[in-house]
Amino acid sequence: MSDLLLLGLIGGLTLLLLLTLLAFAGYSGLLAGVEVSAGSPPIRNVTVAYKFHMGLYGETGRLFTESCSISPKLRSIAVYYDNPHMVPPDKCRCAVGSILSEGEESPSPELIDLYQKFGFKVFSFPAPSHVVTATFPYTTILSIWLATRRVHPALDTYIKERKLCAYPRLEIYQEDQIHFMCPLARQGDFYVPEMKETEWKWRGLVEAIDTQVDGTGADTMSDTSSVSLEVSPGSRETSAATLSPGASSRGWDDGDTRSEHSYSESGASGSSFEELDLEGEGPLGESRLDPGTEPLGTTKWLWEPTAPEKGKE
């Protein structure tokens, strides 16, 4: 009889534990719907304190922790420039930090000095008239993990179906929501100085390769040159990405369904703004945007998940 009671107690505790875990996952956003739309940005122009990172996105957790420890009440922000499935992990670039001010408000000199004391740099991002955006609950650390596996595939599908030129990918942690934002215009204004510097370096390498090829009088580039062009961040296929704060690891691990194309590439025929039904218009948005507002020198991109990546899920 005592054995039956013991087994019943163990079974009851196990069931209670499973129900608790399910409730925790549900509270973290497991069952939350993901709606992607195009419209006004979730934030206005902002001034941020950031640190530039080149390397594994999973190593950015310390940057979130550092920026939050300086001023815990400020919102965290991340701008991911490279697709980790296209660019070598040690070459992926991002900027992580805190939002110091928004709109017409200017950050206090004391706050700027405080962040600069810890090695952060200050930069301002504009408020683009239109963006591709999505939100996800931010209630627990698990919310971050769930968001990277649910929101990014939804963004990929939305952008791919409409052949949009939307990059880089930003994440803003605001109260109990994670806002994902992909600008449809003024993308170059979201490139911090370090990002622009690496872009010019890689672009110079590509131009040097072109010069060498032209010097040989060849009509077409060799296979080696073609590969170099395709994988060079800042040339045809390279630029932008995304992730989060908290103590857990950040970045896109090998298990998600990310495409092999970079953020700054949207295929040869990206759709214009006139072909896009913009939703969620607000005071920050405009009715239509001139498709010619894309920054000079950027290329469009299109997400195309590959079979090997799907097999890793």
Curated annotation (Swiss-Prot):
Motif (LIR motif): 273-276
Principal location listed in the UniProt entry: endoplasmic reticulum
Entry text on domains: The LIR motif in the cytosol-facing C-terminal region is involved in the interaction with ATG8 proteins.
UniProt keywords, alphabetically: Autophagy, Chromosome, Cytoplasm, Cytoplasmic vesicle, DNA damage, DNA repair, Endoplasmic reticulum, Membrane, Nucleus, Phosphoprotein, Transmembrane, Transmembrane helix
Record's compositionally biased regions (Low complexity): 264-273
InterPro entries in alphabetical order: Reg_factor_effector_dom_sf
Taxonomic source organism: Homo sapiens (Human)
Biased composition (Polar residues): 219-247
GO terms under biological process: protein-DNA covalent cross-linking repair; reticulophagy
GO cellular component labels: autophagosome membrane; cytosol; endoplasmic reticulum; endoplasmic reticulum membrane; extracellular region; nucleus; platelet alpha granule lumen; replication fork
Protein's name in the database: Testis-expressed protein 264
Lumenal side: 1-6
Gene Ontology molecular function terms on file: signaling receptor activity
Region ranges (Disordered): 193-313
Transmembrane segments: 7-31
Membrane-topology descriptor: Single-pass type III membrane protein
Role noted for this protein: Major reticulophagy (also called ER-phagy) receptor that acts independently of other candidate reticulophagy receptors to remodel subdomains of the endoplasmic reticulum into autophagosomes upon nutrient stress, which then fuse with lysosomes for endoplasmic reticulum turnover. The ATG8-containing isolation membrane (IM) cradles a tubular segment of TEX264-positive ER near a three-way junction, allowing the formation of a synapse of 2 juxtaposed membranes with trans interaction between the TEX264 and ATG8 proteins.
